[in-house]
Amino acid sequence: MLTTFLNSLMMAMTMVTMTAPAQPQMTTVATAIDSNPNKASKDASDPRAYLNEIDGDKAMTWVEAHNLSTVDKLSKDPRYSEYQADALTILQATDRIASPSFARDGMIDNFWQDGTHVQGLWRRTTWESYRSGNPQWRTILDVDALSKAEGKTWVFEGGDCLPPTSNLCLIRLSDGGKDADVVREFDIAKGEFVKEGFVLPEGKQSVTWVDENTIYVTREWTPGEVTSSGYAYVTKVVKRGQSLDQAVEIFRGQKKDVSAERGVLRDIDGKYVMDTSYRGLDFFNTELAFYPNGHPDTRKVVLPLPTTAVFSGYYKGQAIYWLKSDWTSAKGTVFHNGAIIAFDLKAALADPARVEPLVLFMPNEHQSVAGTTQTKNRLVLSILSNVTSEVRSFDFGKGGWSSFKLALPENSTLSLTSSDDESDQLFVFSEGFLEPSTLFCADAATGQVEKITSTPARFDAGGLQAQQFWATSKDGTKVPYFLVARKDVKLDGTNPTILYAYGGFQIPMQPSYSAVLGKLWLEKGGAYALANIRGGGEFGPKWHDAGLKTNRQRVYDDFQAVAQDLIAKKVTSTPHLGIMGGSNGGLLMGVQMIQRPDLWNAVVIQVPLLDMVNFTRMSAGASWQAEYGSPDDPVEGAFLRSISPYHNVKAGVAYPEPFFETSTKDDRVGPVHARKMAALFEDMGLPFYYYENIEGGHAAAANLQEHARRYALEYIYMFQKLMDNK
């Protein structure tokens, strides 16, 4: 569907980065330095408070000085130019797969970036032309030309197109990659922005079509009218031709919510079904309300389901939910955590107390649901089994629910890319660590699967193999991980190894084909490990819940267990072991550097959280309390202080020299965590690398050239720390 294409276009590229090491030996631990990191951001007693001013002159002078120092040190390595060129060649390759998305009337859309189109092209072709292998594209929007004309670095972030024709789209453009964006109405048929069309100024906002002349807008209508997480919670109706100050309020959440908004439920044909409203009570609990009588009726119905249940679609009159906790219906039926359930929505709204779902799919202890999508007549689930994928097609009829497995590659990572709401076709990508991405088109009704194209191999994988192993964590839990290394790897403890993980927010880490990793690291003798630690979504909600709040040390223990297993197997050893992670994974890296400095010789800390005492007062941090806990709660706050990297740097400890990476335009986590941690290291006389991309948002890069530069810096760092010492 076109709306799906636009909403998912700008998936952040997987970040692969590293840092420089200090001495691996553990020395005598002294008392923690008194750095006042627990002070509020405006506290004058904090010697690093000036770094809170994102674009402040003093802060940016500090940033620019460290950027220059880091680039100067790493780019002098004679390998740097080659690595940057190799990375850019891979990222801009013209023979890579143009990721397709179904549009209306048999058309295929794609968003494309290369050396000429740095910010990108939104373009379209026919299905017949696309599958020919030499598609003839028509440009819909040239983001580079728009950026040049307006003096901006526009990052295209998708949008929302009005069904059934999908000609009118509300396009989101971000200046430099921030979460905040501007919204403009665009006419695809004419290839231009609508004159005097809908326009919303920059903000963290959401917008939904009601009809051709009406939209729902949720934004910060008056200064300060946002939740404690910094998101809007008031929705107003905006009519065509109205100014924003003429908009009429239709819905208001609560300031304590993470976010809230009024929306619209449509069927697969794009027809209006009813209004909905959403309140994010916290990151994992929501109140979803339905308005059976439509707009402007304010009578709402909240179904008696757990607030952890996730609404996953509307299919043939059935509401599809994913249960994240056990639930007992009014009849006493127990529905278990992880199940996909369905029930007649209109019947449920007429008599909410009598909701009695059917179970579509109940994962076993080794499985989890990775995603759902719909075609014209089928519901499709992506399922993980021991971190490998399968795809099943479901149908609902007089006999209830039935399903079959699509004949896609085994032991691969399968990604549901786009589905067609005018047929039963869907695009599926298949890939593995050593298997380049292959695009399939599957028919969810007949089960027919057609290979469309594959990415050429970008590195020599002939002598490599990928294996899955299991480590035993501190509490006895078995934790899986993948290891990619040479088939003839010498188990002598000297193999340079990068260990990556995320471990949070129920996000699973799966094998994927990273051409940059392969070319710059694996092909040159490096090994790579991916840890499926608790906190992620590899084995469903329970695997995630096991690492929440004060149980989060389990996540960190799991990661350490994988590292120790690699060392015990003599795959690697501390002088040759580096770790990397971004965002929540950046917090993971910070914790590992502080808790076990004796295990690592390199640590890459990307767009991280690091101050866990003050994170709720930084950027969107308040929205993550359901994951991490509240610093204001006595028990949770004490735990957060005990694991907060910023609060546990100690004098007299030989830490590995870290590589901190962030972005000035990151308005989700923000650059302050990384800035102040690096400044703390600086104040203590500890060595570190620091690089802050001026553009890029939470993805830390706004275009392919910036990604290539970042990769080159990271891998030079890794080579110097892990390979050059062999």
Curated annotation (Swiss-Prot):
| EC number(s) recorded for this UniProt protein | 3.4.21.-
Q: Where is the active site?
A: 583, 698
Disulfide bond annotation, renumbered to this chain: none
Q: Which organism is it from?
A: Sinorhizobium fredii (strain NBRC 101917 / NGR234)
What family does this chain come from, according to its entry?
Answer: Belongs to the peptidase S9B family.
For this UniProt entry, what's an example GO CC term? Answer: cytosol
Claim: Protease is one of the keywords in the record: yes
Name the domain of life.
Bacteria
Q: What is this protein called?
A: Uncharacterized peptidase y4nA
| Gene Ontology BP annotations | proteolysis
The GO molecular function terms of this record are:
oligopeptidase activity; serine-type endopeptidase activity
- What keywords would UniProt list here? Hydrolase, Plasmid, Protease, Serine protease
